[in-house]
Amino acid sequence: MYYIARRLAITLSLSSVILGAKAQVAPTDSLGETRRDSVRRLDEVVVYARQMLGSKFEARNRTGSAYYLSPKELKKFGYTDISRMLRAVPGVNIYEEDGYGLRPNISLRGTKAERSERISLMEDGILAAPAPYAAPAAYYFPNVARMYAIEVLKGSSQVQYGPFTTGGAVNMVSTPIPKNFQAGLRTSYGSFGTFNTYAHLGSDHKHVGYLVEYLRYQSKGFKKDEPNERTGFYRNDVVGKLRLHSDEDAEIRQALELKLGFSNEHSDESYVGLSEQDFASRPYYRYRGAQMDQLQTRHTQTALTHLIDFTGGLKVTTSAYYNYFWRNWYKLNDVRIGDQKGEKRSIEEILADPETNARYLDILTGATDRLGEALMLRANQ
C-alpha cells in the first residue's frame, strides 16, 4: 500500500499597500520656483490564496502571460475533461492517455507533458500533487466537472505559486459559497455508459455561509476487453465548506472558511498496450491478460483559510491545509512460461518484438494456455 500525507505550513499572501507620499517643500531654484516631489497613487492589488487571477480583467492586466476560463465559459461547454477545457488557451499542449481526462498530460510553453510533471497544478491555490516536484496526474487530479473557473499562468509570472518558472501554473477554482440560497442538480448521460451527475446546496446568512457538493462520474469505457469488457471507471467527490465572516461594512473585515473534501476512484485501466500490427487493425482492443489490471485511489483534504481586510488597502490571506492520498495500481508486469528466470518477459519486451516472443504474446492475448504459465501482476504504488 502507498500512503502520502502532506502537511504544509501556513502560506501568506499580502496585497500591495497604497502609498501616498506627502508632498514636501523642496529648496527653491535660482528662478525662485518651488519644486515638490511628485505624488503617485498606486492601484490596490489583492492576491487571495484560492485564486491567482479572479477575472478576465486581471488576466489581461497581469504581468506575464495569463488566461482565465470564466464560469460562463465552463457552463457553456459543460466539459468534464480538463484536456478539452484547456484547448482554448494559447501555449497549452495536451496529449490524451485514457480518453476521459482522468490523468492528463499538460504542457505549458513546450515543457515536458508526461503526467503534467513540469507545471504546478493547484486547487484553490493549494498544490494538488503530493510534493512540488511530483507528477500530479500520476497520483491525484481534481475532478474539473465541479470547478467554478480555471486559471492559467505561464512562465516566470507564476513564481509565487511554484517552482516551474519555465512552464507555469494551472489553478482550478472550486465553487464558492453562494450569497443567497442555491440548490441544483445537473445530470448527463452519453455513449459507452458515460454518466455524470453533480448536486450542490448552499447559502449565506448574516455571518455564516455553507456549501455541500457531490459529484459522480463514471463510464463503462470504450475499449474492448474480452471476456468481461471491464475497461471503465467511477469517481466520487464530496466537498463541504463552512464560512464565518464579519459584516461587509465592518471597519476591519474578517472571514474564516473551512473546506473538507473526499474523493475516490476505481478504474479498470491498464499499462498494457498493443503490438504494432494489432494497433493498426483494432486500436481500441485490449488483451485478455490485462483484465485484472485495476487502479484504486482515495484522497482527503482539510483546508482552513482566514482573510483579514485592514483599512488602508492591506489584506492578508492565510491558508493552512492537510492533504492525504492513497493509491495502488495493480497492473500486469510480466509473462512467465516456466520456472526459470530466463523464461520471463516484460510487457515491453513482448510488444516490442512480438515475433521473437510469439509464445509469450499468445499467453498475453489468451490465444493459448501453457503448462506453468503465469501472468504476473505488480502493485504499482
Question: Which residues does each predicted region cover?
Answer:
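N-terminal periplasmic accessory domains that precede
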Residues: 82-85, 104-110, 119-122, 137-143, ...
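Outer-membrane beta-barrel pore domains and translocons
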Residues: 50, 155, 173, 186-190, ...
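Acidic/polar loop-and-plug regions of large Gram-negative outer-membrane beta-barrel proteins
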Residues: 243, 252-305, 328-381
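Short acidic/polar hinge/loop motifs at secondary-structure boundaries
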Residues: 126-154, 240
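Extracytoplasmic beta-strand/coil segments of soluble accessory domains associated
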Residues: 58, 83-130
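N-terminal periplasmic "start-of-domain" segments of outer-membrane beta-barrel proteins
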Residues: 39-77, 102-105
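Transmembrane beta-barrel wall of Gram-negative outer-membrane proteins
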Residues: 182, 189-219, 226-270, 294-310
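Flexible, solvent-exposed coil segments and beta strand-coil junctions
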Residues: 88, 174-182, 214-224, 277-287, ...
